[in-house]
Amino acid sequence: MSRPRRRGRDINGVLLLDKSQGMSSNDALQKVKRIYNANRAGHTGALDPLATGMLPICLGEATKFSQYLLDSDKRYRVIARLGQRTDTSDADGQIVEERPVTFSAEQLAAALDTFRGDIEQIPSMYSALKYQGKKLYEYARQGIEVPREARPITVYELLFIRHEGNELELEIHCSKGTYIRTIIDDLGEKLGCGAHVIYLRRLAVSKYPVERMVTLEHLRELVEQAEQQDIPAAELLDPLLMPMDSPASDYPVVNLPLTSSVYFKNGNPVRTSGAPLEGLVRVTEGENGKFIGMGEIDDEGRVAPRRLVVEYPA
């Protein structure tokens, strides 16, 4: 007879983890899941092991809405090593080419300007995008290069921070799907010297407050503190979570009266006043505005359910 599967807590929310360098995003996710004893967990856009910074971890029902964070913009601080190109476009790869750094300040400014605004980017072979059902980095590790189509991205802001010796520091505010490693590699080619990432930190995701980020070390300290005080760790850990609907905070809210929300939660589209004419909406119910799921305005102007919160018994 197989063992019954161990079930974690029904804890719902988003932890803004400050990921440390050298750890994979999945390792970070599993550690947070264990600390919170959560029944489900997922992250919203991986960070390379070399990178640090904001990694939103969705727990419980929040995992249903993590996809909306994947569509959000992000901000990074990056330091590039000029004069060296690597196979992965970062310091974890092998140096494949070395060239002298000879560009002028004017040439640097002109090159940076070509990366601002709406541009197209060919993803790195060392990415998790798939080709014929297989991740690109799996091909790359076998020495195989496959065709990749250029994808549209937007660089809302590209700030020059400093250029000292063979180091170049930038801050980049960009749209979903932007590979900072690829920007640095492409920039190095424009400058004629090659470049790769030696430091990368994700400063922000969507509108999440930076001051709410916490490290794994801090979470462990809270668990120890709870043990010393003889209280459940959840009393110290759970207040760190952002609301479960925070991944969808950019979408308008439609509040349903309780008489309508019961139909919505049973999978039926409902009519209500004050709804937008089209698009996705966050749906709440009652006077307290309890979040019950995501809806979409259908062709008849009704709010149709798309993703619903499952209410577990206490």
UniProtKB/Swiss-Prot annotation:
Taxonomic superkingdom: Bacteria
BP-aspect Gene Ontology terms: mRNA pseudouridine synthesis; tRNA pseudouridine synthesis
Catalytic activity: uridine(55) in tRNA = pseudouridine(55) in tRNA
UniProt cross-references to SUPFAM superfamilies, sorted A to Z: Pseudouridine synthase (SSF55120), PUA domain-like (SSF88697)
Keywords: Isomerase, tRNA processing
GO molecular function: RNA binding; tRNA pseudouridine(55) synthase activity
Keyword Endoplasmic reticulum: no
Active site feature: 48
InterPro entries found in the cross-reference section: PsdUridine_synth_cat_dom_sf, PsdUridine_synth_N, PUA-like_sf, PUA_sf, tRNA_psdUridine_synth_TruB, tRNA_sdUridine_synth_fam1_C, TruB_C
EC code: 5.4.99.25
EC main group: isomerase
Binding site for substrate: 43, 76, 179, 200
Tagged with keyword Zinc: no
Family statement drawn from the similarity comment of this UniProt entry: Belongs to the pseudouridine synthase TruB family. Type 1 subfamily.
Free-text function comment from the UniProt entry: Responsible for synthesis of pseudouridine from uracil-55 in the psi GC loop of transfer RNAs.
HAMAP family documented for this protein: TruB_bact (MF_01080)
Protein name: tRNA pseudouridine synthase B
Organism: Escherichia coli O139:H28 (strain E24377A / ETEC)
Lineage: Bacteria, Pseudomonadati, Pseudomonadota, Gammaproteobacteria, Enterobacterales
